[in-house]
Curated annotation (Swiss-Prot):
This is Acetaldehyde dehydrogenase 1. HAMAP family: Ac_ald_DH_ac. Pfam families: AcetDehyd-dimer (PF09290). It catalyses: acetaldehyde + NAD(+) + CoA = acetyl-CoA + NADH + H(+). It comes from Cupriavidus metallidurans (strain ATCC 43123 / DSM 2839 / NBRC 102507 / CH34) (Ralstonia metallidurans).
Length: 303
C-alpha cells in the first residue's frame, strides 16, 4: 500500500507522541524529525526508530523535501515560528498540519468539521489546542441542537505533560481555543481557561464545558447529541470519557470529561497529548487517503 511521506517539526512531548502514532498509520510514513538541539531526547529517540533527523531547524529539512518525497509536515514547535515554517514548506508544495496555536489556517476538530476541509485544497490546517480538541466537540454537540449564546471551557492538565513550547504559548492557547469554541463549536461567545496542575503523581487531563443556551435547553436531545459525539471522538481517542453530565441548571448545560492517553510517550495521564496528536494524525490520514486515491494534488504556495 502506498504511503504518504511526512516530516515532524519539533521533537518535544507532542512531536514524540505523534511520531509513535504515525509509525502505526496505514497511509502515513514519517521520514524526518526536525529539531534545534542535536542532543534532544526527541531527536535521539527518532534516530533510534530509523527516522532521518536534523538539528538545524526547518532550514535543515528544506534541501531534502523533494528528494525524499515529503508531502505533509506536522509543526509541533511554537506559535511564534510556525508562520515562517509554513511559508518555507508550503512553497515546496508541502501541506502543513499545525499543532501550535498559531492558527494561520482554518481550525480543524475532526468529529465536528473534518469532512468540510476535504474539497477545499487547504495547504495549512490548524489543530487548535489540546483543550480545544477535548472540549469543542461537546460545545458543538449542544449547538447542533439549539443556539449557544456562550461557551466556556476549562482544561486541566498535568504539569509534567506541558513542555516549554506550550508554556510559552499560554496566551495563544487561550485565544485560539476561545476562537475555535465560537467558530467550530458554534457558541456566539467563547472563553477558554487552562490550568496546569503540578500535583504528583500527575493527574489525568480533565475538562469542564459550560454552555449557556439562548432558550430553555431541550434536555433529552442535548443528552443524546452529547453521547453520540462522545462516540465519534472515541473512534480515535478511546480514552475520552464522560465523568458527569450533562448537568442542567436553568439555561446552563455543563459536561465533565476526562481524557486518558494511550501511553505512547508519556504515561496515560497525558491525555492532552493524545487528543491533539490523534486528531492531527486522523486529519493527515484523511488528506493522505485523498492523495493516494488521486483526488488531491498539492500545489506549491508562493507567499
Amino acid at each position: 500500500m502506498k504511503k504518504i511521506k511526512c516530516a515532524l517539526i519539533g521533537p518535544g512531548n507532542i512531536g514524540t507522541d505523534l511520531l509513535a502514532k504515525l509509525k502505526r498509520s496505514s497511509v502515513l510514513e514519517p521520514v524526518w524529525m526536525v529539531g534545534i538541539d542535536p542532543e534532544s531526547e526527541g531527536l535521539n529517540r527518532a534516530r533510534e526508530l530509523g527516522i532521518k533527523t536534523t538539528a538545524e531547524g526547518v532550514d535543515g529539512l528544506l534541501p531534502h523535501v523533494l528528494a525524499d518525497g515529503v508531502q505533509i509536515a506536522f509543526d509541533a514547535t511554537s506559535a511564534y515560528v510556525h508562520a515562517e515554517n509554513a511559508r518555507k514548506l508550503n512553497a515546496l508544495g508541502v501541506m502543513m498540519i499545525d499543532l501550535t496555536p498559531a492558527a494561520i489556517g482554518p481550525y480543524c476538530v475532526p468529529p465536528v468539521n473534518l469532512k468540510e476541509h476535504l474539497g477545499k485544497r487547504e495547504m495549512n490546517v490548524n489543530m487548535v489546542t489540546c483543550g480545544g480538541q477535548a472540549t469543542i466537540p461537546m460545545v458543538a454537540a449542544v449547538s447542533r441542537v439549539q443556539p449557544v449564546a456562550y461557551g466556556e471551557i476549562v482544561a486541566t492538565v498535568s504539569s509534567r505533560s506541558v513542555g516549554p513550547g506550550t508554556r510559552k504559548n499560554i496566551d495563544e492557547f487561550t485565544r485560539t481555543t476561545a476562537g475555535a469554541v465560537e467558530k467550530v463549536g458554534g457558541a456566539r461567545k467563547g472563553k477558554a481557561i487552562i490550568i496546569i496542575n503540578p500535583a504528583e503523581p500527575p493527574l489525568m487531563m480533565r475538562d469542564t464545558i459550560h454552555c449557556l443556551t439562548e432558550t430553555e435547553p431541550d434536555q433529552q436531545r442535548i443528552a443524546e447529541s452529547i453521547h453520540a459525539m462522545i462516540e465519534e471522538v472515541q473512534k480515535y481517542v478511546p480514552g475520552y470519557r464522560l465523568v458527569n453530565g450533562p448537568v442542567f441548571d436553568g439555561k446552563r448545560v455543563t459536561v465533565f470529561m476526562e481524557v486518558a492517553g494511550l501511553g505512547d510517550y508519556l504515561p496515560t495521564y497525558a491525555g492532552n497529548l493524545d487528543i491533539m496528536t490523534a486528531a492531527a494524525a486522523r486529519t493527515a490520514e484523511m488528506f493522505a487517503e485523498e492523495m493516494i486515491a488521486g483526488n488531491l494534488t498539492l500545489e506549491p504556495v508562493v507567499a
